[in-house]
A protein has these predicted regions:
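Conserved, mostly hydrophobic/aromatic
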Residues: 44, 65, 75, 99, ...
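Active-site groove signature of glycoside hydrolases
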Residues: 165, 179-206, 283-287
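Structural preference for beta-strand elements that scaffold enzyme active sites
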Residues: 41-43, 72, 125-127, 194-197, ...
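Bacterial N-terminal signal peptides
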Residues: 2-11
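Substrate-binding/active-site clefts of carbohydrate-active enzymes
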Residues: 20-41, 46-71, 77-191, 211-220
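Active-site-proximal helices and loops of the catalytic beta/alpha 8
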Residues: 19-25, 29, 189, 199-281, ...
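Carbohydrate-interacting/catalytic domains
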Residues: 13-74, 80, 113, 118-119, ...
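Short, solvent-exposed turn/loop segments enriched in Gly/Ser/Thr/Pro and often Arg
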Residues: 74-88, 129-138, 199-205, 228-233, ...
Length: 463
């Protein structure tokens, strides 16, 4: 929600600056390494990840995360939180007091370095949140007022009125740019990080990001930079990956019944028509800015939404606790408080950990789901059901997802013989039970198909 408000607030400025419009669809996106294309990103809010809310608790949980199948750990801001004008009891982690320091509530620099080192030993990448657009009002940078945007009275101002707890940085200042680039370089050099997730990246000039990326690449070129925005210019030189906010908004509206499922296809086609060739977008149904999908749409609705996230093109995101079926309040005002994930709920919702692990495993074992071309397929009820294929080489995967609370029986536009590969997330069967094997071998019966309410099914073409 906040993203669209921000976009509206700066739309006049953007339109004025982009005349004539640059056609990014004719350009090529920055080339990303294979590990970025194949990534499954896992977002961690350190404060609420555990009762202790520290780095060591995350380190102790790395084996579980590795077994889950995620590949990139995104740590929300690790820096001290500002107290002046702070929101809520503890304050927003996005109100940073010192970019070079560690939040003492989370632990020490040594604790963070150990978390990163232990992650690397398990083949996991680690990125941290960088809030480059603004700082807390008690930031150590306040001693240099020229670093900040000021009104005609010389008063430092927030980026937008609702963000009263932060002060806007002024990227017209060359000294500020140098300070920020040196800070980014130090995090890569001193902590051996694997990249950054950059908060409200579109509020910071693109040419700054391009210069910063060029200089950081000299230290460690094989990194991932994730932009929290949705703008094609960011993906040409600076970033590997951008948010897919428009897809998320469409998905939420479809699930609540205010838009037809075909809106997701329309958004996808619009994105592909304006983004550079080879652009990567991050898909998500949940994150720290949003109310939990399970709280909004129930268990089955949340799983259907995430099934789409795992099977669309792009890179999927998991926000900590989703894999347990956690319903703890998320987004503001929870962002400013201590509200730990209720991990024990997984015992009562065992289908959630099974779903996440099995869907990640399916994706890892399918080149088509990771990198295949996407083609939309017609079906007999496109107001409620999405059907599409993912194809690479000789592998052809068909996905059908019912985004409504009513069962579906109809047909999908396809031909040939398929086997069903939908993960089984019910109670585990005995080791010698051959039912799953039989299910895999049988012809799936397409083009006729049935889907439960909020049901999803995945098929692979038999060659």
């Amino acid at each position: 929600v906040w993203f669209w408000l921000l976009l509206a607030s700066c739309s006049v400025f953007v339109n004025a600056q982009q005349t004539p419009a640059r056609d990014f669809s004719k350009e090529t996106a920055r080339v990303s390494p294979d590990w970025v294309k194949d990534a499954v990103i896992y977002e961690i809010f350190e404060r609420n990840y555990s009762q202790k809310g520290d780095f060591n608790s995350i380190t102790a949980d790395l084996d579980r995360l590795k077994n889950l199948g995620v590949t990139v750990l995104w740590l929300m801001p690790v820096h001290p939180v500002g107290r002046i004008k702070a929101k809520g009891t503890i304050g927003s982690p996005y109100a940073v007091r010192d970019y070079y320091a560690i939040n003492p509530d989370y632990g020490t620099a040594a604790d963070l370095k150990r978390l990163i080192s232990e992650s690397h030993k398990r083949g996991l990448k680690v990125i941290i949140d960088i809030v480059a657009n603004h700082t807390a009002w008690d930031s150590v940078m306040m001693k240099t007022r020229a670093f900040y945007t000021q009104n005609t009275q010389g008063e430092i101002i927030p980026p937008v009125p609702d963000w009263a707890d932060v002060a806007d940085l002024n990227y017209d200042n060359a000294e500020l740019r140098r300070y920020m680039i040196e800070m980014l370089k130090s995090w890569i050099r001193d902590y051996d990080l694997d990249g950054f997730r950059c908060d409200v990246a579109g509020f910071v000039p693109t040419d700054f990001w391009e210069q910063a990326r060029m200089e950081v690449d000299k230290i460690k070129p094989d990194t991932i930079w994730l932009a929290e925005w949705e703008s094609p210019d960011l993906l040409v030189k600076a970033f590997n990956l951008d948010y897919s906010w428009e897809n998320h908004s469409a998905l939420m509206n479809v699930l609540q019944g205010s838009l037809p499922a075909s809106e997701i296809r329309r958004v996808w086609e619009s994105q592909h028509a304006k983004f550079p060739r080879g652009a990567l977008l991050m898909r998500f149904s949940d994150n720290h800015d949003e109310r939990r999908a399970i709280a909004r749409f129930g268990e089955r609705g949340a799983l259907a939404a995430q099934a789409l996230v795992f099977t669309l093109d792009g890179v999927p995101l998991i926000y900590n606790g989703m894999e347990a079926g956690d319903t703890t309040e998320s987004g503001a005002p929870a962002l400013f408080e201590k509200l730990p994930v209720f991990w024990q709920i997984a015992d009562r919702r065992p289908e959630f950990p099974r779903f996440y692990k099995s869907m990640i495993d399916l994706r890892k074992n399918s080149a088509a789901l990771r990198r295949g071309d996407l083609r939309w397929l017609k079906n007999s009820d496109e107001a409620r059901v999405l059907t599409f294929s993912r194809t690479i080489g000789t592998e052809d995967v068909l996905v059908a997802i019912n985004l409504s609370n009513q069962p579906f029986f109809g047909a999908v536009e396809t031909s040939g013989v398929f086997e069903e590969i939908t993960p089984e997330i019910g109670a585990p069967l005995p080791p010698d039970d051959d039912k799953p094997k039989a299910k895999l071998k049988n012809n799936a019966g397409l083009p006729a198909i049935s889907l439960d309410a909020f049901g999803y099914r995945i098929f692979r073409r038999k060659n």
